Amino acid sequence: MAAGGKSFLADAGYGEQELDANSALMELDKGLRSGKLGEQCEAVVRFPRLFQKYPFPILINSAFLKLADVFRVGNNFLRLCVLKVTQQSEKHLEKILNVDEFVKRVFSVIHSNDPVARAITLRMLGSMASIIPERKNAHHSIRQSLDSHDNVEVEAAIFAAANFSAQSKDFAAGICNKISEMIQGLATPVDLKLKLIPILQHMHHDASLASSSRQLLQQLVTSYPSTKMVIVTLHTFTLLAASSLVDIPKQVQLLLQYLKNDPRKAVKRLAIQDLKLLANKIPHTWSRENIQALCESALHTPYDSLKLGMLSVLSTLSGTIAIKQYFSSAPGTAATTARSFDLVKLAQECCYHNNRGIAAHGVRILTNISASCQEKDLLPLEQDAVFGLESLLVLCSQDDSPGAQATLKITLTCMVKLVKCRPHLSQSVVESLLTQLHSAQDAARILMCHCLAAIAMQLPVLADGMLGDLMELYKVIGRSTTDKKQELLVSLATVIFVSSQKALSPEIKTVIKQQLENASNGWTAYRIARQASRMGNHDMARELYQSLLTQVASEHFYFWLNSLKEFSHAEQCLTGLQEDNYSSALSCIAEALKSYHKGIASLTAASTPLNPLSFQCGFVKLRIDLLQAFSQLICTCNSLKTSPPPAIATTIAMTSGNDLQRCGRISNQMKLSMEEFRNLAVRYGDLYQSSFDADSATLRNVELQQQSCLLISHAIEALILDPESANFQEYSSNGAAHVESEYERRMMSVFNHVLEEVESLNRKYAPVSYLHTACLCSAVIALLKVPLSFQRYFFQKLQSTSIKLALSPSPRNPAEPIAVQNNQQLALKVEGVVQHGSKPGLFRKIQSVCLNVSSVLQSKSGQDYKIPIDNMTNEMEQRVEPHNDYFSTQFLLNFVILDTHNITVESSVIDSNGIVWKTGPKTTIFVKSLEDPYSQQVRLQQQQGQPPSQQQQQRTAYSRF
């Protein structure tokens, strides 16, 4: 997680980066002061970019005040530009420090004679509702403008009223009656009523307000039966119910009633849309009767478009707790079989419908029922689901239209889900996929390959059977000329790598390389090499990286590819390990380390300030240290042969009282080795905690490396250092845990095998014998024989999150200390901005930011003060929740000792699961604690032998107090 640690925008005139921000603001200010309208508009519309680049309050406050001035004195077009900027920069509004001044300048335009100017001002106030929710003058202006005779102004007032109602309970309660009168008033035009009704969705601040709004909406639905009025009223009704969480079952019943009884298609469509919203948001409130009513409507409707909508709602519900409620035995229905339920009948009927969308929802419902309901009478539905999925697969794989591809995605997702929870169905599913692969369109083939890879990951037993078909297809695709060909080559290669569980045969390598030479570009070859590294096929990966070295234009890319080639070569060296040949194991590890050291040098050269490759470097350095620790452990085990315990070792152990002495010098070496593995486990834990943006597979990979270190340290302790107190219960693996990848499956298998061997030896033999050292060496070789997987985060970052910190006060020069008197406290303000990439919160989201402030005395003071240790350092921690990606807090720090103090502010992130991630950044400033003038004067007088005056004595006593 990259982060900018430099302090900027703290105090006026401080910091180099702030000068950049100030110069940018001055440049825009020059444009605002221009006499040309075009230049003024250009300056205004460039403000959002400025806010994005410098998102701290001091600049944003200055910028918004300048914009408010333009709004006050400019023409309506400029005001409109300022309004657009304000709406685009909504999340920065709360950083305005002088809210009163900003509002005052904007609000002055509300008294204009121009109704358009007033309308723009009302929209401006509405856009600022989040920072001025309780401003009474704004409330009054909105009420007044609702009575205006100018339509533009009234519409603007409606916009502002909706925004203020969402933010302010008082405004919502006060405006509710006014809105009610206007809606029911005969003088209000219908189009205005349609705009007023949606305001009622915000009347959810308390139960009584929600109830009165609901009654009004109920009256409107019955009083105004026109299509537009019913649609707007029903939708507002739904949004109010979803926000207030009151009367949701009643709302579901009302919508179902309109769906069943109202003949208008538009109303039915709206009812379906709102039912879908409620099914997504609150599925647990749906009763069995509600689902039954929806099933009946779907069974009886003659219109495919409506049936599709209803099935969409039912398929959403089928993936939630609502499906269990539906199948739970109702009174008097104990003997009902699964196939007699209307939902099942509907799904079976729709599975083979001529409309692809309807068929997709039908099979999705059957899949969800099979996955979530384990009752015996529901088991026959599995086969129905498989047949439905296979028929859809045949239909959609021949069609490359976007609709067919969307349906195919649903079908393949259902297949993976069904195979995961019903493994006995996997054989037929895989066979149907392989059969269709040959005749399918290329776009469909890519999706089908992804599906096959997902199934093979879950059920490796099926993988070997796929290889023949896949290799045939790979040869065929080489002759294809479609634009999807490159993507298909990558997808197929991935499935082949997953299917080849141990190592690629020479024939497979030859076919893949031949097709790449004939038909692919460099990027395709790189992607295939990346997948090979991920699946542990390092020999293939090394050859592909080698072939790409001469095809890149940038030296950074060259060094990156060269490092990947060296890492692949290093891991390939480890595949030659043999179980009982420990000397060859040492030479293999030495060869691997040689390549790893070359690779880390290239990797360091590939890094840039913007892309420091910190995770990659950290992961590889740990791998190097782990290999060295394994090598050292094998050497230590071998030393039992070259340097066995002396004959008097038992006597020495008895006289010294240290039982380990009877093992000779190997005991001390083993102790050092155990500590080394524990330190490596801690370092892997640190790498895990610093990888906030990593995907779950990468994190699991790091976790497995950490567990292998802990396993070896535990084995050393249990076999040699402390066999008496060895506890095997806490290390036993959880068999029920779901394994996501072949690499994890093989590592877990090794862990279990090693633990069993260690436990068996621990019970049978006393330490230390050749059996014990052989067991440790075998454990090391077993771990190294599992090919390392380089997961996605090593190659690409899908989620990017960074934190920028700004401290105030901050010095002009980072090396200069801030002066503080020792009898005062320093108020340190810490502000921060969370910056995201293109996919924020893809893997995990920031719940809060933990700020840790600590101060350390740089050198001891010359004077010998007897001060408690608590006053010498500051250690504080605060948790703050970012709002619109901004957070701010303050710390009060004491500096009693006269000297230079080093203050460190470190931020870490807490995600929505409460896990702490050590993401940084870490910022440091210096504070020089100075003696206050009065104490200095008293001390000097005492040194000169002059008694202080009475008044001075009183002040001294007071200051001491």
From Swiss-Prot:
GO terms for cellular component: chromosome; cytoplasm; INTAC complex; integrator complex; nucleus. It comes from the Eukaryota. Transmembrane segments: none annotated. The lineage of its organism: Eukaryota, Metazoa, Chordata, Craniata, Vertebrata. Pfam families: INTS7_C, INTS7_HB, INTS7_N. Residues 937-961 are annotated as: Disordered. This is Integrator complex subunit 7. Keywords: Chromosome, Cytoplasm, DNA damage, Nucleus. Component of the Integrator complex, composed of core subunits INTS1, INTS2, INTS3, INTS4, INTS5, INTS6, INTS7, INTS8, INTS9/RC74, INTS10, INTS11/CPSF3L, INTS12, INTS13, INTS14 and INTS15. The core complex associates with protein phosphatase 2A subunits PPP2CA and PPP2R1A, to form the Integrator-PP2A (INTAC) complex. Residues 937-955 have a biased composition (Low complexity). Its main location: nucleus. Component of the integrator complex, a multiprotein complex that terminates RNA polymerase II (Pol II) transcription in the promoter-proximal region of genes. Belongs to the Integrator subunit 7 family. The gene is INTS7. It comes from Gallus gallus. It is found in: Nucleus; Chromosome; Cytoplasm. One of its GO terms (biological process) is RNA polymerase II transcription initiation surveillance.
